[in-house]
A protein has these predicted regions:
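N-terminal targeting signals for export/organelle localization
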Residues: 1-93
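Alpha/beta-hydrolase fold active-site loops
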Residues: 116-117, 148, 199
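Structural microenvironment flanking redox-active thiols in thiol-disulfide oxidoreductases
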Residues: 131-171, 181-189, 227
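A short beta-strand-turn-helix
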Residues: 86-91, 96-117
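Extracytoplasmic
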Residues: 92-94, 112-114, 145, 158-161, ...
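Thiol/disulfide oxidoreductase modules built on the thioredoxin-like
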Residues: 165, 169-174, 180-232
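Conserved redox-active cysteine motifs that mediate thiol-disulfide chemistry
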Residues: 113, 121-138
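Active-site-proximal beta-strand/loop segments in catalytic clefts of secreted hydrolases
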Residues: 121-123, 153-156, 180-181, 214-217
């Protein structure tokens, strides 16, 4: 038989076993929030890792890897008269620079694809440039051919006859005449971090990628210069 409850006896708490106290509910809620936050952080990290692993590569990375390897190969020859050459440490495709030939026809650096180019920017107001020009002319005479050309681009912005007169005065006979009267070619290389003053020289491989860059003049026709450029061309 069910025992009778005394008149003053409190009712039994039938919810005590099923309803946790409020502090416990708050603790459970906080744990759930922490778990959700941790899961979100893990998801963000995983998405970031996936994105890094699968992001598109710079097209220059693959195309210009050979130029970086060429730079490493010739690094031991960066000495003496060409000690100031900075060989490429990372793949860099040289901008497709625009300039003109002696007849005023439009050219681009990409017109030399398949050939190694020693690109030189010079001006008549630049004393080191004028002194360097005979060495560049001699280098073209020694090594110029189907696989290599010294491309010296004048960037005088006034009096287009002045650079031509200078080249005639110093008997430059082997260099073709190229010019950019806007000097935009210099600004493009400067923006790319490859030009800081005059003269500026960039050795460009047949794919249009930087092998090395030099700020300032050099005796390019010296034994050091000829050996360096010949090595870049893989000539024996």
């Amino acid at each position: 038989m069910r025992s009778a409850r005394k008149p003053n006896e409190p009712k039994p708490n039938t919810t005590a076993a099923t309803e946790p106290p409020v502090p416990l509910l708050q603790k459970i809620g906080r744990l759930r929030l922490v778990s959700a936050a941790a899961a979100l952080v893990i998801l963000i990290v995983l998405v970031g890792i996936y994105g890094i692993a699968h992001r598109p590569r710079n097209p220059a990375d693959a195309a210009c890897a050979g130029a970086v390897n060429t730079g490493k190969r010739i690094a031991q020859l960066v000495r003496g008269e060409v000690a100031a050459l900075a060989v490429a440490q990372a793949p860099f495709r040289v901008p497709d620079l625009a300039f003109k030939d002696a007849k005023g026809r439009d050219l681009r650096l990409s017109d030399w694809r398949g050939r190694t180019v020693l690109l030189n920017l010079w001006a008549t107001w630049c004393v080191p440039c004028r002194r360097e020009m005979p060495a560049l002319d001699a280098l073209q005479a020694l090594l110029g051919g189907a696989d290599f050309e010294v491309v010296a681009v004048n960037v005088d912005t006034r009096d287009p006859q002045k650079p031509l007169a200078f080249l005639k005065d110093v008997a430059i006979a082997h260099l073709a005449y190229y010019s950019d009267p806007s000097a935009r070619i210099f600004e493009e290389l400067k923006t790319a971090g490859k030009a800081f003053g005059m003269p500026t020289t960039v050795i460009v491989d047949p794919s249009g990628c930087e092998i090395g860059t030099m700020a300032g003049p050099a005796e390019w026709a010296s034994d050091d210069g000829v050996k360096l450029v010949s090595a870049a061309l893989a000539r024996r």
